[in-house]
Structures are given as C-alpha cells and as structure tokens.
Amino acid sequence: MVTVYTCKNGVRIVSEEIPHVRSISVGIWVGAGSRFETPEENGITHFIEHMLFKGTKTRSARQIAEEFDRIGGEINAFTSKENTCYYAKVLDHHGELAVSILADMFFNSIFDANELDKERQVVLEEILMSEDAPDDDVHEQLWGVMYPTDALGLPILGTNKTLSTFSSDTIRQYIDKHYCPENIVVSIAGNVTKDLLLHIEELFGSFERSPNAVEATLTNPEFHSGKFVKERDVEQSHLAISFPAISVMDPKLNDFIALNNIVGGNMSSRLFQEVREERGLAYTIYSYQSCYADVGAFTIYGSTNNQQLSVMQDTINETLEKVRTDGIMDIELLNAKEQLKGSFVLGMEGTNSRMSRNGRNELIHGRHKSIDEVISEIDEVSMDKVNHLINSILTADPAIAIIGQGVK
C-alpha cells in the first residue's frame, strides 16, 4: 500500500513497504524540468543535476562515489522536460546512509568554480555526443519544429552558448526559484522501516521556501506542423514524424497508449510488421507517446539507407492511412490491452519501478491507483475510444524531421 505524508514545510514523503525484499529505492523528485527554463537558462536544470554530484561541504565528488561503491549501492539522476529525479538503490540496512548522502547532495552542494568549469566540459561532450548520433539529433530537431517558440522545443542539455553563462550564482538563483518544499516529493519503496521514514522527515521536513520561489506555469503551447531537413554524410537517413496528441492528465490516456501499441509500440505492431518484416526497409521502426501536463505528441521514428528513405516514408504513410480509413481490429485491441497489463504488472516487481511510479504520480497527479485499478482502467479501453483518437490525432498535419544524405 502506498502512503503519503506531508511534512510541515510541504515536502511530501511517499512510501510503499515491500517487506519481502532486501533493498530500498529512494528518489528525490523535483517539479523542475527544462520546459520551465527561460531561453537564457536553457540547460541549467540538467547542469544542476550534474553539479549535485560534484561535492558538498563535507563530501568530495569522489567520496560520494566511493560511499555508494563501498555498500554495493547505485546512485544516479535524470532530467526531463518537466521534472528532475535524484535516486539511489541500496540494501535495506544501508537505507539511512543512502538518504543522508542524497540529502547532503541536495542541500549542501558547494558548486565550486573549478568543478563548474570541469562539468561544463563534460556536459558539452554530452551535447556533442547527442549531436553526433543522428537518431538522437533527429528527435531533438523534431521538438524544435513542434514548439519553435516554447521551452518545450529546446534541448534538455542546453547549448554551448547557454552553458558558458552558468555560474554558482545563477545555479543558486534557479534552485531558489524551483527547489521549494511544495515542489518536492521524496519517494521510497522496498523494505522500509518507520525509523527510515522519520529519518527522511528529519532531513527534508524543515527547510524553508525561498522568498524568490516561483510557481511553475504551464504555457499550453501551440503545436506547429512543418519540416526540418539536415544534410549529413551518414549511411542511413533518419526520419521522425509527430502528431499533436493528448496530455498526461487526459482521461483518454490509456486509449492513447493502446493506440500507440497497435501502430508501432511493439514487434507485432502495424509499422514493425509492414516496414520491417514484410518489406525489409528498416532495422529500427517504432512509435511512442510523449505526454506532458498540458500537451502531448505521437511520434514515429524509422531509419533506413539513404536510397530507401522515400519508400520507407511512403510505407509509413500508407500504413497510417489504412489505420485512419479502416480503424483497428478486435484482435489488435485485445492483444494491446493484454500486453499493456502484462508489462505494467511485470514492471512493478522491482523497487526502482515502484519508487518511480509513486514519485511521478504524486508529483504530477497527487494521487495513487492500485494495480487492480490500473488493470480495470485498461480493460475499459474500447474500439470506439481508440478509433475516436485515431480521428483526432492521425488526421492532423504532422511535424517532420529528417537527417541523412541527399535528403530534401
């Protein structure tokens, strides 16, 4: 059972006890992502995520790494467009130490100028690595087409230009604005004890909101259709196509997930079978849904040799047109629902996945559903609901990004 406790300062502690395991996973979830940055701040959320590992008042970066290695634990973090998470997984008897180190990083990082300069180079290498990978770059460019005037269209990693402006002062100013108690969830799952929960409250329950804190506002940006093309000397052309879709708050979310599953979400999907299995046009072809607090997107990606790009694109369009015209089949919907239920339940067998699900649900929805409730909602997905989504999503003008040799 998931329990939620709100500290006196507004920090929420979400706990799920799983007594038969010998581990705990804990994550600090912050409602701060790249979409809440100004153009000048682009990339700072991700840069802060890096800098929290670079040393505190009492621990060096090396000591942080060594302490987790010494106990056989794992520590990591990620930044998305809407949130940031710092998380760890350790044996249950090391839970208090793991929480203490995470809290030390969270509250006591020093943002040393020398470390800032070194990590700036590390993130720049990360940016260059992403730009060198056309399968990454094409998705980044696609978001720029979809939302050219909104932070959703900017890269999470930032740019060389914005990175060069970040200092300890700008970092602290951003933290003051967004790392406020009511914007933070500490999620923990596993063999959790009452003493460990009290330890979390002691560490996170008393820090105060900065007077400079701001409320994150959603912009509900307009989706833009259009096309981006980049010429590159590569063996394969990379194609990404995106349609405007629904938000994570939409009650039709499960219908959308089922639609994605049928169109390109697995090996038996329409796109995989037609593009890869029947015609041998691509090794990689898939679709996925991106759902945020106010907007969403349905995206298709495929890569093929440069001479076959137009054939692959025509095949994708033909497949989508058949879905639009004929709808889906009963067996496809049945299989999609069973696959969704199976992947959901199997994914809940680890402490990391439970911690992540609970933290994300609390931060985004402020509520939690049991496994049975989720399965029941998946069972309610119907042909009419999915076909309605087909008519509202797949009939819109898409955004397109292409990277390859001789593309146009």
Where are these regions (language model features)?
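Short alpha-helix boundary/capping segments
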Residues: 36-43, 250-259, 263, 267, ...
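Charge-rich, well-structured scaffold segments of protease-associated domains
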Residues: 6, 17, 63-212, 229, ...
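M16/MPP (pitrilysin/insulinase) zinc-metallopeptidase core fold and M16-derived inactive scaffolds
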Residues: 20, 25-89, 265-281
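N- or domain-start disorder-to-order transition segments that initiate the globular core
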Residues: 1-23
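His/Glu-based metal-binding/catalytic segments typifying zinc-dependent metallopeptidases
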Residues: 27-29, 212-269, 402-403
